[in-house]
Amino acid sequence: MAHINQNFLKLPGGYLFPEIGRRVRAFSAQNPPMPLIRLGIGDVTQPLAPAVVDAMVKASREMGVKETFRGYCEETCCAYDFLRFAIRDSYRERGVDIADDEIFVSDGAKSDCGSIGDIFSADNVVAVCDPVYPVYVDTNAMAGRAGDYDGEKWTNLVYLPCTAENGFFPELPRERVPDLIYICSPNNPTGAAATCDQLKTWVDYANAHGSVILFDSAYEAYISEEGIPHSIFEVEGAKTCAIEFRSFSKSAGFTGTRCAYTVIPKELVREGASLNALWSRRQGTKFNGVPYVVQRGAEAVFSPEGRAQTRAAVDYYRNNARVIQEGLTAAGLTVYGGVNAPYLWVRTPNNTPSWDFFDLLLKQACVVTTPGAGFGPSGEGYIRVTAFGDAEATWEAVRRITSVL
């Protein structure tokens, strides 16, 4: 008889977003005429930049000609040189020297954040910020690192509370020393962005204890304030303790196109093994690379035209964030984030439980948000609102929300 991975049976009933989808479908089935505005799941609404589309069209035509057809990508790290070089140069513009063979192109930061555990022992102690992007937790639970779920927390995880009192940035753990430390900045879901000094504290800690920081930088394109690092490798010492994940999804609208990249410096060594080499071995075995057409589209993001066009889309979402922040604040709600991130972390009124406030906004305002409790215990009493909607819909959502408070 085939035996299953028992860790899957420990997972709670449903991943956060499918549960939201279930409630939304149930409401829509009972109220078919009601037009919903979705400010929950962080999917973009603006189309791909013209420069990206043109590059993909050109690449598609190349695939239809024998002389320019591309099959499996046999170049380094399952990625074409043209894209890795463009990514490398973008780092160098910020004073970060990354070698092209330290860049691994993939089909999404979610995939890489979820799969990076393949190169680490199941015995590693994992630390996650609380609230936290659920993928970090669930993938480690699947791998057997999380222990058992007690209805609120996993018994083997180290939770790092991120609250209004500490500026939504975690303090160093006082008890167990984690081996793997997940940090997301700008943060999903709170919208907070870490300073160099804050990250340096964690870099020094990781280097002192031999830990590895798994740094999710998927939203760095939304940083608007000076002094906020776009990469953890802007922090001295990070190359010996950190892996960075980035994505084209929110910076260039690739949620339906799928392209991202992970940076693993060759200086990052644990137990005598290069993590760069281990990940290369893992990817070579389990991943055949992102399609040539998509990689050409991603390359175009770094062209002068592509940069200007994708920046315009980012600014569009930033303006949505401003509208949400100003509108909900004027209505008396406490709102965090939205300045360096496309997410706003909104305190529920009168200590209303997150799911109750989610249901109220769904049923009375026909607006879909994300309950903070779905991101962990410290998320209770908040909802996450995304700035990825259409501008007109965002204005209308704010009007609807304020009308039911």
List the model feature ranges, each with a label:
Residues 31, 208-209, 331, 365:
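Helix C-cap/helix->beta junction micro-motif
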Residues 89, 97, 351, 360-369, ...:
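PLP-dependent enzyme catalytic core of the Aspartate aminotransferase-like
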Residues 150-153, 234-315, 322, 326, ...:
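Conserved core segment of the aminotransferase class I/II
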Residues 295, 299, 314-325, 335-347, ...:
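Conserved glycine-rich beta-strand-loop-beta hairpin in the small C-terminal domain of fold type I
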Residues 67-206, 220-235, 243:
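Conserved core of the PLP fold type I
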Residues 3-107, 301-304, 405:
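N-terminal small-domain helix-loop-helix segment of the aminotransferase-like
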Residues 47, 317-318, 331-364:
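Conserved PLP-binding catalytic core of the aspartate aminotransferase-like
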